[in-house]
UniProtKB/Swiss-Prot annotation:
Residues 115-129 have a biased composition (Basic and acidic residues). Sustains mitochondrial morphology probably through maintaining cristae morphology. May act as a component of the MICOS complex, a large protein complex of the mitochondria. Signal peptide: none annotated. It is a single-pass membrane protein. InterPro entries: MIC60. Belongs to the MICOS complex subunit Mic60 family. It comes from the Eukaryota. GO terms for biological process: cristae formation; mitochondrion organization; response to reactive oxygen species. It is found in: Mitochondrion inner membrane; Cytoplasm. The gene is immt-2. It comes from Caenorhabditis elegans. This is MICOS complex subunit MIC60-2. Component of the mitochondrial contact site and cristae organizing system (MICOS) complex.
Length: 654
């Protein structure tokens, strides 16, 4: 306000005519000065709303002029404390409402809204459907998770960008407020030469940035609310509730909301400093006003106005009053210091007197409590004697009471003690017996384990010997290159097997198998599988040549050879599993059937079919039949021994 008066007086002073050129110039200068003053008052009223309200209250009709010249009064900006933080919904199915600032009352703005807008019924917002709970068309859970992940990523990006923009806007607002505070301080300290135009510019800039950061904050709050809504919807889905982005999104939303709240508190703190500066300027103005009133009270005829030229005599008068006032204040300060020092000295003296009085009283009490040395010794001796007598009587009484109580206790609880002792002995006896039984079981188990280990070792050795026996029956002596050389005797391996079983006396099954095995197999060995296949093919080839020989001579052999050479071998239509009718079969068809059975792996059936041949074919196949049957018997016995060894190993495992 003082700046506006300075501006008005300066303009009035500059508009005065340097000379007295006439009444017209004086009237023009007066009108210009009034116009400039009115413009200055209007300009400052546009800056300071309080000054405008005071002006409208003092000067009637000024409100219409001000509304016409500088426009209607702007509505008050929403305060920072009216902003509310982000609201979270307690029900996860209901998304939180987007953030909206508290509406400003329309009466303050002075604008009448349309009645249609106020009477319009509010539309009831429908709750958004959750796309992650269920749908009419079934979706793949993987597709729902991917859709939720993509949506959360987009919302996270938007929320972070909006929060960053809002934070930057808040920082700019803080800088503008600090600049406004600094310009106010500089203008106040400059006094008459203060630049209040820069204060106005700084105020308008801070106001514009505050409105801008409010919009940015609203957008950021809405973006964070959308992020929380999407995370809540995803957390309700059966297949999307375990998505790792759901808790991350909620934590990020809370972090961004806290960041916005922190920036709002920073803005409030800086704005509070601006309010303090405004109070400081008011105090300075109040002090100057009081000083002016003092001057008017002392010198009523003194013309003291801002911007007016002061006479030298008046200036000396003002300086003299100021020096007098300073001397008075200095004298008052000195008197206050002296009074304070006197008060402190009186308090110290009173405290000292209190301490001395207390010390004197304590000394008197100690002197009154002193007992002569002789009386003290006599009193101590009498007191010790009386105490000893009392202690002796008390000890005797206590011993008697304890003795009586012990006798009563022994009589009452003797039976209970005996029963408790007997019960404890029985418990200890049962516990010791149980422990001894467990110990005996452990010893028996350990001895049994030793025997089982021996049996298990023997069973493994028997299994290895049986495997060697089976391999010898199937493959023979692999080092030999001739058929007879590959026949490996089985007698030594049977002796090894019997020794593994304890000499054959402890295992009757092995002993029976050893007895059932052919002596030829033990001494000479058996033909291998490959050798039997070779002999079978040779027997079939020779048997076909003599298939038509019964008991004739050489001509019959020649005839059979020619006939078999000219005979076309036909594969029978019957399967290999079909039964045979010996009456309708001949040697030729029997050999063909035997070959089919041998190739299909049914060697026992092939041997039986060869036994149905007759004549020279039977004589040719007789040795082969005996060797093949003996080899199959040895193979069967080795398999039985192998199964017996496996069973023995299982039984000996613990």
């Amino acid at each position: 306000m003082r700046g506006s008066r300075n501006l008005l007086t300066q303009r009035l002073a500059s508009s005065r005519a340097t000379g007295s050129s006439g009444g017209l110039k004086f009237v023009g200068a007066t009108v210009g000065a009034v116009t400039a003053g009115a413009a200055g008052v209007a300009g400052y009223a546009s800056y300071d709303n309080e000054f405008r309200k005071k002006l409208e209250g003092v000067i009637p009709g000024s409100r219409t002029i001000l509304n016409y010249t500088i426009g209607e009064e702007e509505p008050p900006a929403p305060r920072l404390k009216d902003l509310r933080p982000l609201q979270y919904s307690a029900d996860p199915k209901v998304p939180p409402k987007p953030f909206e600032p508290k509406p400003v009352k329309k009466e303050l703005i002075g604008v009448k809204e349309n009645l249609k807008e106020t009477t319009e019924p509010k539309k009831i917002e429908k709750k958004p459907e959750n796309p992650y709970i269920g749908a009419k068309t079934p979706l793949n859970p993987q597709e729902r998770n991917e859709k939720l992940t993509e949506s959360l990523k987009n919302h996270l990006t938007q929320a972070e960008k909006a929060t960053k923009v809002a934070t930057s806007a808040k920082l700019e607002t803080i800088r503008a407020i600090e600049h406004h505070v600094q310009t106010i301080r500089e203008a106040i300290e400059a006094g008459k030469d203060g630049d209040w135009d820069s204060v106005t510019v700084a105020h308008l800039k801070a106001k514009r940035l505050a409105e801008k950061d409010e919009k940015a904050e609203k957008l950021a709050r809405n973006a964070v609310a959308d992020l929380v809504t999407e995370a809540n919807l995803g957390g309700q889905g059966e297949t999307t509730q375990l998505n790792p982005l759901v808790p991350i999104s909620k934590a990020t939303a809370e972090k961004l909301s806290n960041e916005l709240d922190e920036m709002i508190s920073n803005v409030k703190h800086v704005d509070s400093e601006r309010i303090f500066v405004h109070d400081y300027s008011d105090r300075v103005a109040e002090s100057r006003r009081k000083f002016q009133m003092e001057l008017k009270a002392v010198h009523p005829n003194l013309n003291y106005e801002d911007g007016m030229k002061i006479k030298k005599a008046d200036l000396h008068t003002i300086l003299a009053h100021a020096h007098l006032r300073i001397d008075q204040l200095s004298q008052k300060l000195i008197d206050s210091k002296l009074n304070e020092e006197k008060r402190i000295q009186s308090i110290i003296a009173k405290k000292k007197e209190d301490l001395l009085e207390k010390l004197r009283l304590e000394t008197n009490a100690k002197q009154a409590a002193v007992i002569p040395e002789f009386d003290k010794k006599k009193l101590d001796a009498e007191l010790a004697r009386a105490t000893a007598e009392i202690q002796k009587k008390y000890d005797e009484k206590l011993k008697e009471v304890v003795r009586t109580q012990k006798q009563l206790y022994d009589i009452e609880h003797a039976k209970d003690v005996d029963e408790a002792v007997l019960k404890e002995r029985n418990l200890h006896s049962s516990a010791v017996g149980k422990a001894l039984a467990q110990l005996a079981g452990i010893e028996k188990a350990l001895s049994g384990h030793l025997q089982m280990d021996i049996e298990n070792r023997k069973s493994k050795q028997m299994w290895l010997a049986t495997q060697n026996l089976k391999g010898t029956v199937i493959f023979g002596n692999r080092a030999s290159c001739c058929m007879e050389g590959r026949r490996a005797p089985l007698g030594d391996q049977m002796k090894t097997l019997l020794s593994c079983c304890g000499g054959g006396n402890s295992d009757e099954f092995v002993k029976t198998i050893n007895t059932a095995m052919s002596k030829t197999s033990k001494v000479r060995g058996e033909y291998t599988e490959q050798d039997l296949n070779t002999r079978f093919n040779k027997v079939c080839r020779i048997g076909r040549r003599v298939a038509y020989v019964n008991e004739g001579g050489a001509l019959a052999h020649l005839y059979s050879w020619l006939k078999s050479s000219l005979t076309i071998e036909l594969v029978p239509k019957k399967g290999a599993n079909e039964s045979l009718t010996p009456a309708v079969e001949n040697n030729f068809t029997l050999l063909t059937r035997a070959e089919q059975l041998w190739k299909s792996g049914k060697k026992s059936d092939a041997i039986r079919v060869l036994q149905l041949t007759d004549g020279a074919t039977r004589r040719v196949a007789a040795d082969f039949i005996a060797d093949a049957r003996r080899q199959h018997e040895a193979l069967l016995l080795s398999r039985l021994l192998l199964a017996h060894a496996a069973l023995t190993s299982i039984r000996s495992t613990y």
